[in-house]
A protein has these predicted regions:
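Residues that define the transmembrane beta-barrel architecture of outer-membrane proteins
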Residues: 23-29, 61-66, 106-115, 159-165, ...
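Outer-membrane beta-barrel initiation region
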Residues: 1-39, 235
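Transmembrane beta-barrel strands of outer-membrane/channel proteins
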Residues: 1-6, 47-55, 72, 79-85, ...
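Surface-exposed coil loops of outer-membrane beta-barrel proteins
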Residues: 3-17, 83-170, 184, 191-232
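Short loop/turn motifs that connect adjacent beta-strands in outer-membrane beta-barrel proteins
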Residues: 36-47, 73-77, 119-133, 170-182, ...
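Surface-exposed loop and membrane-interface regions of Gram-negative outer-membrane beta-barrel proteins
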Residues: 42-74, 87-105
Length: 288
C-alpha cells in the first residue's frame, strides 16, 4: 500500500484498536505479556490476564498502556476488569470495513464487563436457539486529547463514563446444517463527567449527573441532561445498531452476509419509510 497527498488509506487506520495514524513517518515498539483464558477451556473455571505497553513516534501519544486486564470465567459467564481489545461480535475484523455502533477503531478503555462470549444453547429448543451478549461500564481516557484538539475553545468533555450492552440470537444448528442466522442489538451510551460548551465569548462548564441513578438511566435509557433545554431527550448520548448475519459454512470454507441499521434515538430503531414522518406540529410523529 502506498499513499500520497498526506492521505492515509482507510484500511490502514480502521479496525486496529487505535493503532492508526495520519503521520507518514511513524513507528512503534510494543511489549506484551498475556495468559489467554483459552488455556482453561477444559475446566469449569478459567483465569486470564494481559498487559500491552507501547512506545511510539508519529502517533497521538508517545507512551501508553494499550491493554491491561484480568478476566475470570465460570462456565459460560466471563467477567473482565480493565482495558482489553474486544473483537466485533458478528463481523470479521480482518475482512470487514468495521461496525457502526461497537466498532474496533479506538483504543480499549478501562471497564467492568460481564459477558457470554460464546453462544449458550437455550434449553428445550433442540439446539436451534443460542444466545450471547455483554453488559459493560467503563470510563473514557481521552480528556487531555480532547482539550488539546479543541484548544479549549470548542465543545469538549472530561471524565465521561461509558456503557455498552449487546445481545445476539442464533437460529440454526451449525454442527448439523450449513445455514444459520444471527440477529442482534448493540447499544452504547456516554454519560456523566463534565461538558464544556461555548456560550458567546466564553466556555461554560456544565457538570453532568454521575450518581447511581445515572447508571440506571444509561442501562435503561431514561432521565434527562442539563443541556437538553426545551428538547425532549434522555440522559447521556445513546446510540446503537440492529445487526444481522446470514451464514453458510462447510468443512473447507464459509460465506457470511451481514447488515447493520444504525440509530441514535427511538425513531431510528423503527423500520419505516424515512418519508413517513409528518411536518410542522407532526414533525416527530409517524404519519400513516
Amino acid at each position: 500500500t502506498t499513499q500520497s497527498d498526506e492521505q492515509t488509506p482507510f484500511w490502514l487506520v480502521a479496525n486496529r484498536y487505535g493503532w492508526g495514524t495520519l503521520t507518514s513517518s511513524n513507528g512503534a515498539v510494543i511489549a506484551e505479556l498475556e495468559r489467554s483464558i483459552a488455556h482453561d477451556d477444559a475446566r469449569k473455571w478459567g483465569v486470564g490476564y494481559g498487559v500491552e505497553l507501547a512506545a511510539a513516534r508519529g502517533f497521538g501519544s508517545t507512551l501508553w498502556v494499550q491493554q491491561a486486564f484480568v478476566e475470570v470465567r465460570w462456565r459460560h459467564a466471563l467477567l473482565t476488569l480493565g482495558s482489553k481489545a474486544q473483537p466485533m461480535a458478528l463481523k470479521d475484523g480482518q475482512l470487514s470495513t468495521g461496525n457502526q455502533a461497537l466498532g474496533i477503531n479506538a483504543r480499549p478503555i478501562p471497564e467492568v464487563r460481564l459477558s457470554l462470549p460464546r453462544y449458550w444453547i437455550v434449553p428445550f429448543t433442540h439446539r436451534w436457539l443460542r444466545l450471547k451478549g455483554h453488559v459493560a461500564f467503563g470510563k473514557t481516557t481521552d480528556d487531555s486529547w480532547q482539550h488539546d484538539f479543541t484548544q479549549g475553545q470548542n465543545r469538549y468533555t472530561k471524565g465521561v463514563l461509558f456503557h455498552s450492552k449487546a445481545g445476539y440470537l442464533m437460529i440454526g444448528k451449525p454442527e448439523q446444517f450449513p445455514f444459520s442466522l444471527e440477529l442482534g442489538l448493540e447499544m452504547a451510551c456516554q454519560f456523566g463527567g463534565k461538558s464544556f460548551i461555548r456560550q458567546g465569548n466564553q466556555m461554560v462548564e456544565i457538570k453532568n449527573q454521575s450518581g447511581l441513578r445515572s447508571f440506571w438511566n444509561a442501562f435503561f435509557p431514561s432521565g434527562s441532561d442539563a443541556t437538553d433545554g426545551k428538547f425532549v431527550n434522555k440522559e447521556g448520548n445513546h446510540l446503537g445498531s440492529w445487526v444481522a448475519r446470514f451464514n453458510y459454512d462447510n468443512a473447507q470454507w464459509g460465506l457470511s452476509c451481514y447488515a447493520d441499521q444504525y440509530f441514535e434515538d427511538n425513531s431510528s430503531m423503527i423500520h419505516i419509510n424515512k418519508n413517513g414522518w409528518g411536518k410542522g406540529a407532526d414533525a416527530h410523529k409517524q404519519v400513516r
